[in-house]
Regions:
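Glycine/tyrosine- and acidic-biased, solvent-exposed loop/turn segments at the edges of beta-strands
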Residues: 2-94
Length: 94
């Protein structure tokens, strides 16, 4: 069957990483869907990298990537959380 779990990670890796799945796709509404053991985090919606509040990829080293609907629009300081939210609204309403 499809990997799926409501209310917690569907996979808890031996190294301490965690993955949230819904209907077989990486997905989480209220946080990163993939938390690596080193602290790196990735936000997914229905299997694609996506985050409206900030970067969809946040690495402990400080590296960031800005994604919407599985398309990368920037990295690191191309946006900050405020400018990203403004940009996302222009994408949605264009």
């Amino acid at each position: 069957g499809m990997i799926h779990r409501d209310g917690g990670p569907a996979i808890e890796w031996a190294d301490g990483g965690k993955s949230w799945y819904k209907n077989g796709k990486l997905h989480r509404e209220d946080g990163p869907a993939f938390e690596r053991c080193n602290g790196d985090k990735e936000w997914y919606k229905s299997g694609g990298l996506h985050r409206e509040e900030g970067p969809a990829v946040e690495c402990v080293c400080g590296y960031k990537e800005w994604w919407s609907n599985d398309k990368r629009y920037g990295k690191n300081n191309d946006f900050n959380n405020e400018s990203w939210q403004v940009f996302i609204k222009t994408l949605i309403f264009s």
